[in-house]
């Protein structure tokens, strides 16, 4: 096994901009590598929003190694099967013993968590490691010449490395590009629903919640996903439909009547769940163009998470990939023997992470295409592939659900961030020292 939590003999000062999942993951991993970490977060209090989160083996193996609080694992739901339904309810494909199969193949579980539970566990771990937090501080400008951030309040922070973990609407990205760079709509939006078991009286629906499984319903231009969280005490549903939010509006309260109308005629189980909804929000799904580089020329700014590779939720890899980013970056920085090796470490990070992150983004768009086919010849051909698995029991070759596709699942779930770093360092060891050369980028950026 790769050596974990390798500590560098040199201690970098690192500023992480953003205390979402990617920021906290990076703060933990870099702190475990022996560096001094300060997080700047615009929110005055860390109240993570969101609902369910599917944490796949490529991330759970990292989280286990970070020794997060036991209560996180106690709050998880581990699905025993994955079922794909035609929107009418007819089963197209299923994998039973999913939990056992996943653990056997990847030596780490597939868990469904509440986003708040994961976020609070990461925050607690970061504080335990001595990470400093400046809450209510919005980074406004970055002086790359001085390696310094300035917040709207006037507070300044100097660091050897600034990590852009400020999400989809990244201010760091605008500073790096020296221009406003808003995210782009994908044409889809999400309705997010969480139901409490205590509010469900229907015996069949209660059974679904109490016995964790993962269900997908796929239909023309839309699909739904449902799974248990909080150890079977809550049920998370996400509905993906064409975007009808106005330009410039990223989220707003939704109409329950409108939401239910979009799924009229779908599986009665799904519509019975939707009849229990008392309030819902609509979230515009956004993406970004690829950056030319995730590291600036001065090697004092690096991107992680949604700031560089936001992902549609169709493979549930946004959070998982962000955790990978943090783990790889932190472990690489643990290999440094001197500060002048920082540029090499960051180049290696980009080599290990950029192509994979951008490839996952492309796979999410392919999954949307496979799940959202309108009725017709292509949909019928897709369903025949699904049915062949249901009848034969074994998936071979390309498969419309990448969650169980033998070509995609091992690539996604089999990824070992720490081993990737160890293999890369073995192939290209860190030299005794390296001069920080290269072209200078912009000195100060204030959009």
Please give the residue ranges for each predicted region:
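Active-site-adjacent segment of FAD-dependent monooxygenases/related oxidoreductases
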Residues: 51-125, 371
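C-terminal helical "tail/cap" subdomain of flavin- and related membrane-associated enzymes
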Residues: 2-11, 74, 81, 89-91, ...
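Residues at the starts of beta-strands that form the adenosine-phosphate
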Residues: 13, 36, 234
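Accessory recognition modules or surfaces
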Residues: 2-15, 46-58
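Conserved mid-domain beta->alpha element of the FAD-binding
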Residues: 16-36, 40-43, 163-164, 226, ...
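Short phosphate-binding/catalytic loops that engage adenosine nucleotides
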Residues: 35, 68, 131
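Conserved FAD-binding catalytic core of PHBH/FMO-like flavoproteins
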Residues: 88-91, 120-278
